[in-house]
Amino acid sequence: MQRRWGWLAMVMATLVALLGGSARAGEGVLEMRIYTCEPGKLEALNERFRNHTMKLFEKHGMKNIAYWEASEGPTAGNTLYYIIHHASREAAKKSWADFQADPEWKAVAKASEEKYGKILAKPPKAIYMTEADYSPASEKAYLDKSYELRIYTTALDKLPGLHSLLKEDGEKLFKSHGMRSSGYWTPTDEPKSGNTLIHIVEHPSREAAKESWKKLDADRRWIDAKAKAEANGKLLAVSPDTVYLKTVDYSPKP
């Protein structure tokens, strides 16, 4: 009987994660997709997602987690970023095939391109990801917050060291300076799986983000933790690739 209840508890925990406001990659696979639009076509893409695409994703077993646009920098005004959840990598493959073959999707895509012309400047970039063991559950995004996508590329064999730094010191120090992590993910496919960490940070505002990073960089606890972690060499091969994001109006509500 005890074993039976343990099994039921595990099933219920999985359902809560998948049906509620968050999803763990351990219960499936997460996919980040980045769409680059032709000049002036981002709102056409947003219209298609808002009115049709998200519903069709759910129809084919893909769970919408969060959607953003870049709020500044070279990708502002032409790029959509989003995260979806799949039951498994095989399920993802089937879902995308079924979605692409769906007559409803074909009609939507045809109608939007007849109305607006070519919308995407290039094929979408897809990154399948797994959560780090210290990551919060991937969750929906708030409209009134500022988000920051940070992509870290480590030096050779330094990804475990970066994980340790963030797990043991970084995360608690981020919180102490008003920054809240939405998730830490590692790509599942080589070569990125061995040297890349994807991190999204939630800030109360863009100005708050600037102030928080300034305070963190001056914090002796962070300076010492980083120096200790890099005693045998730099962790990062290059500076983090950073994009500030704003949540779009059709992103699932928390």
Where are these regions (language model features)?
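Short S/T/G/P-rich N-terminal loop/turn motif that feeds into the first structured element of a domain
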Residues: 18-224, 230-254
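Hydrophobic alpha-helical segments and their boundary regions
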Residues: 6-10, 106
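Bacterial N-terminal signal peptides
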Residues: 9-18
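N-terminal secretory signal peptides that target proteins for export/translocation
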Residues: 1-4
